[in-house]
Amino acid sequence: MSPLSVQNLTAHYGATQALFDVSLEVAQGEVVALMGRNGMGKSTTVKSICRMIPAGGTITFDGNDLRALPAHKAAQAGIGLVPEGRRCFPNLSVRENLIAAARPGPWHEATVLDLFPGLRDRLDQSAATLSGGEQQMLAIGRALMTNPRLLILDEATEGLAPLIRQAIWDVIARLKQDTGLGILLIDKSLKELSAIADTAVILDRGTRVWGGTIAELTPEVTNRHLGL
């Protein structure tokens, strides 16, 4: 059984249905790309998995029913989330941001700083003084400090300068190589996703319209479903 199994996921915003029986799985050590045009349900899927919005269907992680969790408590189940948009506490220092997210396990301040050495000299500075790229690195560091078994990255490279974007892709590649984390990625960078992901799922208007290995993600598929 895959650590994360999502079956027949549905979600609504008021009277409007946003997801229609979406299914996907993420195995331990696997990188899965969740793809689709803007507004097709990718972030809604992530929010549903992480108990940020109500959802129907079945969501299990390590055999446990995530829908039984209190809202916004995905970290307790072992899921680390970097949501769309950079998320940190601007009124806290970098170190305080990391400490606030900490849960027992191998990821701690030193291991996060090994991954993001550029934050080492900024530990005692307010997170509000960081650049956008540094804030995103801090957001990923905070997610890792929860010591997850599954890491979800929702548009983690969106709006960043090319060098910072590449640095984050390098970090994701390192996490894939050196850890047993399952990783669920949402990103528009087809080239980078194709280089790092094992499998992909494509959503269109809240419905899963394609799923397969990265090798099967042909130009015909991307043109039909992504307009690329």
Residue locations for each model-derived region?
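Glycine-rich phosphate-binding loops of nucleotide-dependent enzymes
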Residues: S2-L228
